[in-house]
Swiss-Prot record:
Major subcellular site: secreted
InterPro entries in alphabetical order: Hepatitis_B_virus_capsid_N, Hepatitis_core, Viral_capsid_core_dom_sf_HBV
Species this chain originates from: Hepatitis B virus genotype A3 (isolate Cameroon/CMR983/1994)
Region called 3 X 8 AA repeats of S-P-R-R-R-R-S-Q, residue ranges: 186-208
Protein name: External core antigen
Similarity comment: family membership: Belongs to the orthohepadnavirus precore antigen family.
Length: 214
């Protein structure tokens, strides 16, 4: 299996240093977390069960439908677009290598091992990575991070003390907006005091002017 990893690294042609870290470190098993620079961690993603993530094919179709123009653009759009490009390129190289190994291995057992390893281990990591960056682009990074924390708290709470259904990512933006509005109310309540002071100042000036006239 280490030989397979070595072939994977040699064949991976990702264009940037960050993508090289993804292929050399994350898929190799080094302690490199591709989510840290985005405020998340591998452990935070691991709270989501494997069947939560759509298939790679569905995720690639979603990325193409929503962000194809930005992904194909030579310009730098955002770190999430860049990471998404790199993940797509890495997965393409992984599948090409797995296909090559599968067609050139005479032993059916070894062929099945390679295919299962790619689909189970590397496939899950790529599904997590694609889902994370697509979700950040769609809902916003802060919303996704809030969802991961909420789901982590929910899944670790005993069933008797938690809601029956897990949090839903698509409903979090509504609660986020409400919270922002609630946070914005406190300064608004404080604003009348300076206004009253300002409104009082002309009155005082008028009273002073009247006294001077008298």
């Amino acid at each position: 299996m280490q030989l397979f990893h070595l072939c994977l690294i040699i064949s991976c042609t990702c264009p940037t240093i960050q993508a090289s870290k993804l292929c050399l470190g994350w898929l190799w098993g080094m302690d490199i977390d591709p989510y840290k620079e985005f405020g998340a961690t591998v452990e935070l993603l691991s709270f989501l069960p494997s069947d939560f993530f759509p298939s790679v094919r569905d995720l690639l179709d979603t990325a193409s439908a929503l962000y194809r123009e930005a992904l194909e653009s030579p310009e730098h759009c955002s770190p999430h677009h860049t990471a998404l490009r790199q993940a797509i390129l890495c997965w393409g190289d992984v599948t090409n290598l797995a296909t090559w190994v599968g067609t050139n291995l005479d032993d059916p057992a070894s062929r099945d091992l390679v295919v299962n390893y790619v689909n189970t281990n590397m496939g899950l990591k790529i599904r997590q990575l694609l889902w994370f960056h697509i979700s950040c682009l769609t809902f916003g990074r802060e919303t996704v991070l809030e969802y991961l924390v909420s789901f982590g708290v929910w899944i670790r709470t005993p069933p008797a003390y938690r809601p029956p259904n897990a949090p839903i990512l698509s409903t979090l933006p509504e609660t986020t907006v409400v919270r922002r509005r609630d946070r914005g109310r406190s300064p608004r309540r404080r604003t009348p005091s300076p206004r009253r002071r300002r409104s009082q100042s002309p009155r005082r000036r008028r009273s002073q002017s009247r006294e001077s006239q008298c």
